[in-house]
Amino acid sequence: MANEETCDKYIEALDDPKVSKIVSNCTFEDLIFDHSIVTSSIIQDYDFTCDRSYLRQLYGVLYMVGMGIGSYIMGAISDKFGRMKALMLGVLLVSGSGILGAFMPDQHSYGFLRFLTGIGGNAFFMVTFVICVEYVGPKYTMLSGLIIEIPFALGELVLGLEAYFIRDWVTLQLVAHIPVLLLFGLWFLIPESPRWLLATGRLDEAEKIVRKGAKINNKELPEDIFKTDTLENESLLPSIPEENPTFLDLFKPKLMFFRSLNMMYQWFSVTMCYYGLTFASVDLLEDPYLNFALSCFIEIPGYLFCIFVMACWGRKPILSFLQVVSGLSCIAAGLLYGIKSLEILQIILSLIGKFGASACFAIVYVYTAELFPTVIRNTAIGNFDYLKK
């Protein structure tokens, strides 16, 4: 890899005595790359050096923009066409753009595919979260919404392990994305969300899925449980609005207005802290792989902490407490930056900050799902997730 200093070279001779500059800009061919950590990288292959070094950050921004757009459109697709169809579209975008990205001849094509990967990648979590919550009853909504975070952290750890053993970026790209193709098999293994089918009036399909699940669990259901009049009497059939809910509906009436503003700030602040600590984690120690592993591993205790305490202490107290802990830890870690004698303390404080940020990240998903009514819930999660990016 090359740093900014390697983009200059010494001038061999100075004919003009007035010239004080002793270096001149060099070309890509003049650079010597350090292969002690990686054998190849996109920085070298796509020439993200010197006056083109900004492209590396730009394509990172494109990925985040894709995630933001994906939050919005995938939520709409999920509500209109079904959870599983939205999930399969996400699988197609991530696997297709990820695999093709390893063979792109130029950096602009690669950047566009990273954008598509961001769109599809966000569908994985959002749609899967909704499916997990809708597959269980109210008693297990919180537990289901929190447990799903743990495989997310484990996936990050696996990616770090792959990167440690695979130092060629093309091979790593393929190893990380080819297994995603296996997720197409979920179409045949996981049925559509019965709650979504009920909400869209497809009662026969919902009944078939629920009865199959009851049979597997040795449960018996009443014969008329999915009759329209029974559902209406028992208030089990979700009300369907005449018009599709929009972003503006999040601010009607007054109670929803303040609730939405509050949650928008929660999502924004939590996400900024979470991703900021994640991106900065590679600079904690000299070994970037160990840094990444520590940053990912600390998320798991954060999620487990939420599982054990939220049922007893509620959402708002835990969210407030963890935000204070995370914020103070980050401020303290920043004040200790550059002090070699306190480097270990800075790392510990950074990890405590990531612990709190990860836990907050999980809580805001569950909290939003519980705060907003059914007809506007998916719109709220999708739009807040879009705004946070």
Regions found by a protein language model. Give the residues of each.
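Structural signature of the two symmetry-related core transmembrane helices
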Residues: 85-100, 108, 150, 318-333
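The feature captures the transmembrane alpha-helix scaffold of multi-pass secondary transporters
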Residues: 54-57, 107-115, 127, 177, ...
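Helix-breaking motifs and short loop linkers at transmembrane-helix boundaries and internal kinks
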Residues: 82, 103-108, 120, 166-167, ...
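C-terminal transmembrane bundle
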Residues: 114, 149, 267-270, 278-389
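Flexible cytoplasmic loops linking transmembrane helices in multi-pass membrane transporters
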Residues: 2-54, 215-284
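Glycine-rich segments within core transmembrane alpha-helices of 12-TM secondary carriers
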Residues: 64-67, 121-126, 130-190, 292-295, ...
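Hydrophobic core of transmembrane alpha-helices in multi-pass small-molecule transporters
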Residues: 38-39, 44-48, 108-122, 179-181, ...
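Membrane-helix boundary and inter-helical linker elements of multi-pass secondary transporters
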Residues: 79-80, 102-105, 134-138, 164-168, ...
